UniProtKB/Swiss-Prot annotation:
<protein>
    <recommendedName>
        <fullName>DNA replication and repair protein RecF</fullName>
    </recommendedName>
</protein>
<feature type="binding site">
    <location>
        <begin position="30"/>
        <end position="37"/>
    </location>
    <ligand>
        <name>ATP</name>
    </ligand>
</feature>
<comment type="similarity">
    <text>Belongs to the RecF family.</text>
</comment>
<dbReference type="InterPro" id="IPR027417">
    <property type="entry name" value="P-loop_NTPase"/>
</dbReference>
<dbReference type="InterPro" id="IPR003395">
    <property type="entry name" value="RecF/RecN/SMC_N"/>
</dbReference>
<comment type="function">
    <text>The RecF protein is involved in DNA metabolism; it is required for DNA replication and normal SOS inducibility. RecF binds preferentially to single-stranded, linear DNA. It also seems to bind ATP.</text>
</comment>
<dbReference type="InterPro" id="IPR001238">
    <property type="entry name" value="DNA-binding_RecF"/>
</dbReference>
<dbReference type="GO" id="GO:0006260">
    <property type="term" value="P:DNA replication"/>
</dbReference>
<keyword id="KW-0963">Cytoplasm</keyword>
<keyword id="KW-0227">DNA damage</keyword>
<dbReference type="GO" id="GO:0009432">
    <property type="term" value="P:SOS response"/>
</dbReference>
<dbReference type="GO" id="GO:0003697">
    <property type="term" value="F:single-stranded DNA binding"/>
</dbReference>
<keyword id="KW-0234">DNA repair</keyword>
<dbReference type="InterPro" id="IPR018078">
    <property type="entry name" value="DNA-binding_RecF_CS"/>
</dbReference>
<keyword id="KW-0067">ATP-binding</keyword>
<dbReference type="Pfam" id="PF02463">
    <property type="entry name" value="SMC_N"/>
</dbReference>
<dbReference type="GO" id="GO:0005737">
    <property type="term" value="C:cytoplasm"/>
</dbReference>
């Protein structure tokens, strides 16, 4: 799938604009602060109903404007189109519409418009808390395993019930046992989906990474959130007193993590910033391949400031891999000359100059 039309109104400093992007490579260039990243943010808002730059959406709404709106027309892989719209009012009301109908949840957007973001904060995938890596993992599982979302919702409900009981002691023994059983069943299902996903992801990640950078010995492993040699029911029983003291459940899928190690160390501790960026890119590109295999569709990639941290050789290698995905890519940079060479002649490339919030489409540099 790809976006064939994007309409943006009152998003940060951007002037109202309608973009007709290329189905493949789109390069947005201009000075720092011109609004390039805000274009990526608008697409992200359309696909996930949230910003990647702010946990609150009020800062995204242009000054003195009552609301921001992003509309998109999606070219579906199986043919036909789908119209998506997201609007956020300053007073807090949020509207999501799909083909003219109100949507029930942002998950419907995510399913129709799978997005991959690579930006300066992407280092957090290696350096940050386990929660960030769980989000990465579960994004991938969600897009290849349709049974994952219902299982995840059951897990969250069971965890809320158990944690409430741990804090307040309001459940009778029979109810406690019932919720523990539900927690263990949902946990086993989630763990199975995650393990299967990592088994499929690892060889694709390793192959992709080898095309970007030589990092012999880098390993990717999955920790499920409790002892691999014990059943969760047993672990919960043995840690009950500690869970009550802490007020929440210590073991389970909510504690899962992905571990990237090199020479016995956490990869983030010994890799350079450029190497870390390439590892993150390899993970994101590998996810894109799995989405394509499972859905017979494609992710849309948002790559903010692609040239940063990379020399010419690695920049070209990354562009080549993004191009080989045959998906739609939006790339920002200050100087588009850094990205002018290396694309295949048959690959459609669109250039957009961004200056003080105004966006103008310029000619493909190869014409």
């Amino acid at each position: 799938m790809s976006l064939r039309r994007i309409m943006v109104t009152a998003v940060r400093n951007l002037h109202p604009v309608t973009l007709l992007p290329s189905p493949r490579i789109n390069i947005l260039y201009g000075a720092n602060g011109s609004g390039k990243t805000s274009v990526l943010e608008a697409v992200h808002l359309l696909g996930l109903a949230r910003s990647f730059r702010s946990s609150r959406l009020n800062p995204v709404i242009q000054y003195e404007q009552p609301a921001c709106t992003v509309f998109g027309e999606v070219e579906l892989t199986e043919g036909g189109t789908c119209k998506l719209g997201v609007s956020r009012e300053r007073q807090g009301e949020f509207t999501i519409r799909i083909d003219g109908q109100n949507a029930r949840s942002a998950a419907q957007l995510a399913e129709l418009l799978p997005l991959q973001l690579i930006n300066p904060d992407s280092f957090r995938l290696l350096e940050g808390a386990p929660k960030i890596r769980r989000q990465f993992l579960d994004w991938g599982v969600f897009h290849v395993e349709p049974r994952f979302l219902p299982a995840w919702q059951r897990l969250q409900k069971a965890l809320r019930q158990r944690n409430s009981w741990l804090r307040h002691g309001t459940l009778d023994p029979a109810s406690q046992a019932a919720w523990d059983r539900e927690l263990c069943l949902a946990s086993a299902e989630i763990d199975e989906y995650r393990r299967n996903y990592i088994k499929a992801l690892k060889p694709v990640f390793e192959r992709t990474l080898s095309e970007l950078v030589e990092l012999d010995g880098l390993t990717l492993s999955y920790y499920r959130g409790w002892d691999k040699d014990r059943e969760l029911q047993e672990v919960l029983a043995s840690s009950l007193l500690r869970d009550q003291q802490m007020g929440h459940t210590q073991a389970g899928p909510q504690r899962a993590d992905l571990r990237l190690r090199l020479a016995g160390n956490n990869a983030a501790d010994i890799l350079s910033r450029g190497q870390q960026k390439l590892v993150v890119c390899a993970l994101r590109i590998a996810q894109g391949h799995l989405v394509s295999q499972a859905r017979r569709g494609h992710c849309i990639y948002l790559v903010d400031d692609l040239p940063s941290e990379l020399d010419d050789q690695h920049r070209r290698a990354l562009c080549r891999l993004l191009e080989e995905l045959r998906c739609q890519v939006f790339i920002t940079c200050v100087d588009h000359e850094l990205l002018r060479e290396g694309w295949q002649t048959e690959t459609p490339v669109a250039l957009f100059h961004v200056e003080q919030g105004r966006i103008t489409q310029t000619h493909d540099h190869r014409e």
